[in-house]
């Protein structure tokens, strides 16, 4: 079997294809947030609204350009008090622009290496100077986009911002995990045509083992692949099914993308039957599952926003709009991390968090998607949100009662 894995990331078919082609070459990144403040080019999908929320000065959110934040109840996770122990989210992607204004204060930091000596493996984990993660493509600590990725918009930068974009920093956007998530950047795929740019099982296994060893509690996979190996299966089983090998280790959850490119089966890692797999099913702001969405195995499957999503870019404007199942995965990852970092759930291990928060509360929400047209989801799926766990409301659009969705900002 070919040892390379086809790493696939799709666009949502409900919107013009041109809106998916935002990855244009650029030389610099604007931090003004000007692009994020403008009306969205897909505003026909998302009615414009000004958010009266004093908890953030991010213009993208306040101007109504981040419909998905309140859609998942993300603003309920924001607090005036610092989170004592943010949840580490391992992002498996093409890297991330660590200097971006939305990310530079929202990255996981390996303190031993950050405060150690350059060129020395200060923490003895086998990786030198791995301050914010590791580049498994070029096997070095620089996790920013490399090679042919430089100057492009960067898929990983966009995903990282949907997980944990910094709130209230006077820039463009905020994320559900702004307070409670920190992103560990694991560069596992490149942008060019070189053999080493392709995702392969050995690299994924190394990255999974690294993330588990370094304390990641949410593993975010916005891509999918159709083939696997016994070794890769075993690595995912260690992370998402087996008890933690280390006493006191809370364990980890894998958030997997359910693609919307017309394939019959969801592919890996969504296809794994492991008990700590949570799947993101792409939906629009109308509660409709994206056409072409693959069938997901039974389990913890949640509808998560995919269309007309504003996020950070490594390109000139600093921000861009994207549509697709990747967005659903990153948004769900940030939401889960933000919940897990908040009281009283921060003390839970992975299995207890899944049982008491995700399965017993989130999956019992009264908000569900509509059934899909192909019949793969005849009862729809529960919509991902924090409202069943909410103790307060931040704006009129958050946590509406059943039957009020038509008045909700979308």
Residue map of PLM features:
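Subtilisin-like serine protease catalytic core
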Residues: 35-42, 75-200, 228-229, 272-276, ...
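C-terminal subdomain of the subtilisin-like protease fold in secreted/lumenal serine endopeptidases
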Residues: 21, 33-35, 39, 44, ...
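Catalytic-core regions built around general acid/base machinery
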Residues: 228-254, 268
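Protease zymogen maturation seam
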Residues: 24-88, 94-102, 140, 384-394, ...
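Extracellular S/T/G-rich loop segment that most often corresponds to the catalytic His/Ser-adjacent loop
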Residues: 93, 267-341
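Bacterial N-terminal signal peptides
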Residues: 8-18
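Loop/turn elements at helix/coil->beta-strand transitions in domains of secreted/extracellular proteins
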Residues: 85-88, 179-183, 213-219, 244, ...
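Bacterial N-terminal signal peptides that target proteins for export
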Residues: 1-9
């Amino acid at each position: 079997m070919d040892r390379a894995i086809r790493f696939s990331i799709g666009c949502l078919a409900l919107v013009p294809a041109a809106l998916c082609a935002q990855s244009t070459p650029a030389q610099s990144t604007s931090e003004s947030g000007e692009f994020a403040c403008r009306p969205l080019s897909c505003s026909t999908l998302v009615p414009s609204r000004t958010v009266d929320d004093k908890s953030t000065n991010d213009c993208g959110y306040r101007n109504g350009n981040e419909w998905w934040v309140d859609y998942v109840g993300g603003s309920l996770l924001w607090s005036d008090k610092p989170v004592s122990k943010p949840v580490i989210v391992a992002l498996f992607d093409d890297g991330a622009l660590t200097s971006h204004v939305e990310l530079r204060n929202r990255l996981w930091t390996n303190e031993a290496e950050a405060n150690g000596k350059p060129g020395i493996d200060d923490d003895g984990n086998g990786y030198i100077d791995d301050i914010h993660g590791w580049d498994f493509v070029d096997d070095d600590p620089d996790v920013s986009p490399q090679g042919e990725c430089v100057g492009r918009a960067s898929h990983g930068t966009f995903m990282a911002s949907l997980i944990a974009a910094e709130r209230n920093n006077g820039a463009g956007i905020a994320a559900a995990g702004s307070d409670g998530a920190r992103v560990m950047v694991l560069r596992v795929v490149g942008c060019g045509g070189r053999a080493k740019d392709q995702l392969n099982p050995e690299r994924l296994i190394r990255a999974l083992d690294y993330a588990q060893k370094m304390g990641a509690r949410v593993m975010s996979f916005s891509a999918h692949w159709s083939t696997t190996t016994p070794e890769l299966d075993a690595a995912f089983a260690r992370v998402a099914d087996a008890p933690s090998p280390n006493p006191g280790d809370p364990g980890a959850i894998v958030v997997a993308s359910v693609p919307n490119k017309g394939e019959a089966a969801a592919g890996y890692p969504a296809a794994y039957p492991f008990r700590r797999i949570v799947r993101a099913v792409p939906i629009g702001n109308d509660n409709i599952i994206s056409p072409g969405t693959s069938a997901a195995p039974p389990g913890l499957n949640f509808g998560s926003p995919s269309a007309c999503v504003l996020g950070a870019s490594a390109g000139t404007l600093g921000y861009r709009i994207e549509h697709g199942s990747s967005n659903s995965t990153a948004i769900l990852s940030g939401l889960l991390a933000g919940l897990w970092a908040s009281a009283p759930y921060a003390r839970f291990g992975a299995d207890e968090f899944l049982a008491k928060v995700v399965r017993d509360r989130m999956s019992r929400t009264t908000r569900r998607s509509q059934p899909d047209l192909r019949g793969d989801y005849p009862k729809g799926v529960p919509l991902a949100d924090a409202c069943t766990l909410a103790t307060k409301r931040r704006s009129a659009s958050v946590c509406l009662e059943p039957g009020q969705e038509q008045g909700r900002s979308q």
